[in-house]
Amino acid sequence: MSSEPDAGEFHEMREPTVEKVVVHMGVGRGGEPLAQAEEILEEIVEQQPVRTTAQKTIQDFEVREGDPIGTKATLRGEDAEEFLETALPLADIDRKQFDETGNFSFGVEEHTEFPSQEYDPQIGIYGLDVTVNLVRPGYRVHKRDKVSRSIPSNHRLTAEDAVTFLESNFDVEVSE
């Protein structure tokens, strides 16, 4: 059952919303490139990013567990929706990018595609990954500590619901 009105069966508790948007830039190493990536990400999302660290050692990439290798920022509420209005036109969204619970991810190959950014030969070009988490009202029941319950299957978001939400609210066409 989708969130669209079906013969008068539409209910506001079935309307999907954007819970959060996570914007991530993986640099692969610390130092100056990571500092530049943090600065770029802060300009794009207008929020202070946090560093991400390597979860395990990979000798071939010369990365040790605990080394800072990337940066990310989590956007919620109006900030998340404003960012999506800017970022979604820069990406081609395909149905394969949606999971079975309605979440989706996409990449932006060059940070210079954002209106606030210009190419600087001293910095170079960085790409970024965007992950969008969609929920319906009532999903907190699953996450709360006391008396948590599972979400009924007829209330869970599907990929079809997420595509419909994206196309109607953000004016984006999702390709097959």
Swiss-Prot record:
Q: Which GO terms describe its biological process?
A: translation
Tell me one GO molecular function of this protein: structural constituent of ribosome
Query: Which Pfam families would you find in this protein's record?
Result: Ribosomal_L5, Ribosomal_L5_C
Q: Does the keyword Repeat apply?
A: no
| Highest rank taxon of the organism | Archaea
Write down the InterPro entries for this protein, in alphabetical order.
Ribosomal_uL5, Ribosomal_uL5_arc, Ribosomal_uL5_C, Ribosomal_uL5_dom_sf, Ribosomal_uL5_N
State whether keyword Ligase applies: no
Any one annotated GO CC term: ribosome
UniProt keyword terms in alphabetical order:
Ribonucleoprotein, Ribosomal protein, RNA-binding, rRNA-binding, tRNA-binding
Cross-referenced SUPFAM superfamilies: RL5-like (SSF55282)
* Description of how the protein assembles with itself and partners: Part of the 50S ribosomal subunit; contacts the 5S rRNA and probably tRNA. Forms a bridge to the 30S subunit in the 70S ribosome.
Q: Which family does it belong to?
A: Belongs to the universal ribosomal protein uL5 family.
Physiological role: This is one of the proteins that bind and probably mediate the attachment of the 5S RNA into the large ribosomal subunit, where it forms part of the central protuberance. In the 70S ribosome it contacts protein S13 of the 30S subunit (bridge B1b), connecting the 2 subunits; this bridge is implicated in subunit movement. May contact the P site tRNA; the 5S rRNA and some of its associated proteins might help stabilize positioning of ribosome-bound tRNAs.
- The protein here is known as Large ribosomal subunit protein uL5
The species this protein was found in? Natronomonas pharaonis (strain ATCC 35678 / DSM 2160 / CIP 103997 / JCM 8858 / NBRC 14720 / NCIMB 2260 / Gabara)
